Amino acid sequence: MTAHIAGTQIPAGCGFSTVLPDLDFETYSEAGCIWNGTSWVAPIGATKKGIAAVGAVVYSEHPSTEVLSLSYDLKDSLGPRLWIPGMAPPVELFQFIQAGGLLEAWNCIFEYWIWKNVCTARMGWPVMGTGG
C-alpha cells in the first residue's frame, strides 16, 4: 500500500523531505585503504579507495568500521533525530523497526549492511528486516 509513495520528495526548507520514515548513517572505516606512511591510498591494482574499492558488505564487515552518527526521522511529528555513539540507544527507532515499519534511505543497501554488521553484530541492536 505504501510502495507507490516510496521515494516521493516533499519540498522542505532549502531541501526535500521523504514521505516514509528514513535513516542515514555516517561511518568511518579503513576498509579499502592502505596507509603508505603519509596518507591513505587505494590498494594495489585498485583505481579507487574506501567503500568504492571493496563494496558495502566488505566495508561493513571490516573491524575498523564504526558508526559516527545516525540520523533518522520517523515522520511522527517529532522531527529528525541524531544518534551518536555514547548516547542512549534510539529505542523509538528500534520499536518502529520491530513493529515492521518501513524505512527509506538514500543508499538502502549500505544502510542495511551497516545496521546488520556493525549495529546488530557489534552493538546488540535488533535485527532489521528487508521488507521483502
Question: PLM features: residue spans?
Answer:
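N-terminal accessory regions of nucleic-acid-interacting proteins
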Residues: 1-33, 37-44
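Conserved DEDDh/DEDDy metal-dependent 3′-5′ exonuclease domain
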Residues: 3-4, 20, 43, 50-132
